[in-house]
Each structure stands twice: as structure tokens, then as C-alpha cells.
Regions:
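Soluble non-cytosolic domains of exported or imported proteins
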Residues: 20-25, 64, 147, 151
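N-terminal capping segments
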Residues: 1-44, 71, 79-99, 138
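Non-catalytic ligand/cofactor/substrate-binding and regulatory segments of enzyme domains
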Residues: 1-17, 118-147
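...with weaker cross-activation on analogous glycine-rich loops/strands in unrelated enzymes
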Residues: 39-125
Length: 166
């Protein structure tokens, strides 16, 4: 399993390499960074990654609520409800994940490949609608996040307060 920091830092090394899109599209870029970290994958596109490669996925806001931030090395997706997934053989209601990038950390943004080639973008760019955590990457989220721990403590305080009132 790859450490999320290693994965994010490896993605960031591509910022000045000027690799054209015809060499690496967005899905191939994610695969290349994984390969550089020792993991080989052969996905059919960003829709395949969205459906098969993630241990967690949700909207950008859901990720912020669950983790308190976007974890370094998380995949950022543009997911549309335009039916484009059907052309790619997916007949579910999971949307059309038409673009993917790698979040490299606060202040560093995201690395992705577009028609302009591999480039850096803001991590909070409106293009990114969803976040996914790869099964192959350790995001250090196995334990409770600070937010989840606080919610549990507050739940216990409510229970104890009710018991003490009786």
C-alpha cells in the first residue's frame, strides 16, 4: 500500500515536465503516478476508477465534513449527470466521471492532465465536484477523524446529561 504523502508528492513532481495530453490523458496520468509508486493498474477511464478503484467516494463537501479536509493524494473528480456514462457501458446512477486529478495538498492544488497536458490546478477549483480515496493508498483515515471523535464525545455528554437528570 502506498502512503498518501508519497503518492501526492510523486504527482507533484510532474508540474514542470510538460507532458502532452496525447501521451497521458487524465486516467493514464493517475495510473502513471501509481506505477511510479510501485502499483500497476489498467483502468478503462475515469468512470472505471470512479466505480471500481475507490474505498470511499463522495462530494467535495462530504469529504470536508467526513475528514475535515481533502486528504493529500485523494483523487478529485468532475462528475456530471449528463448520461455520458452510458456511452461508456455504465447503466447505473453513479454519474459520468469525465475527469480525474490528484490532490497534492493545501497550497499545492491538484495535478491533472487536460488538453493542455499535465498541469497544476487549484484544489478548490469548481471543476472538482467529487473526491475519492483509492484502495491502493493509505490515507491514515482508518481511525476516527477529529470531527468524528468530537461528535462521539458530544453524543456521550448528551447521554450522561440525560442520565444525571433522572
Amino acid at each position: 500500500m502506498i502512503d498518501c504523502i508519497e503518492f501526492a508528492e510523486q504527482a507533484y513532481t510532474y508540474r514542470d515536465r510538460h507532458i502532452p495530453y496525447k501521451e497521458l490523458d487524465c486516467q493514464a496520468f493517475v495510473e502513471k503516478v501509481l506505477h511510479d509508486c510501485g502499483v500497476s493498474r489498467n483502468w478503462r477511464g475515469s468512470n472505471h476508477i470512479w466505480r471500481e478503484a475507490l474505498k470511499w467516494r463522495g462530494t467535495y463537501t462530504e469529504a470536508l465534513v467526513k475528514y475535515g479536509c481533502i486528504p493529500r493524494g485523494a483523487l478529485l473528480f468532475t462528475v456530471k449527470t449528463d448520461g455520458g456514462e452510458k456511452k461508456r457501458g455504465y447503466n447505473d446512477k453513479d454519474g459520468n466521471a469525465c475527469h480525474v486529478g490528484i490532490f497534492t495538498g493545501e497550497g499545492y492544488g491538484a495535478m491533472h492532465s487536460t488538453t493542455g497536458g499535465v498541469q497544476q490546478a487549484r484544489g478548490d477549483d469548481r471543476r472538482w465536484t467529487h473526491v475519492g480515496l483509492l484502495k491502493d493508498v493509505d490515507y491514515h483515515t482508518d481511525g476516527l477523524t477529529d470531527r468524528e471523535m468530537l461528535e462521539k464525545i458530544l453524543d456521550y455528554v448528551k447521554i450522561i446529561s440525560e442520565v444525571l437528570k433522572k
